[in-house]
Amino acid sequence: MSVKIRLKRMGAKKRPYYRIVVMNSTSPRDGRAIEELGYYHLIEKQNQLKIKEDRMKDWISKGAILSDTVKMLLKKNNLNAKSQEV
């Protein structure tokens, strides 16, 4: 089973927000998550990103793969994902 850290879309039509979750790589986008690590509010005046960094480091050390979008969000918000990879 391959595990990924990726975004899960939530919210109403045309008002999305995203949860950063750990999921099986074959699960659908809005499927059941193993664990929720944080959220990303796109519509807010200031894009809000909140992540449980200790849990993310733990999942990366267990072999979880970051999606391209999550990597981009971490880089954009000065949270270096490469330093967390083992």
From Swiss-Prot:
It comes from the Bacteria. Keywords: Ribonucleoprotein, Ribosomal protein. The keyword Zinc does not apply. Disulfide bonds: none annotated. Gene3D superfamilies: 3.30.1320.10. The keyword Zinc does not apply. Pfam families: Ribosomal_S16 (PF00886). GO terms for cellular component: cytoplasm; small ribosomal subunit. GO terms for molecular function: structural constituent of ribosome. Belongs to the bacterial ribosomal protein bS16 family. This is Small ribosomal subunit protein bS16.
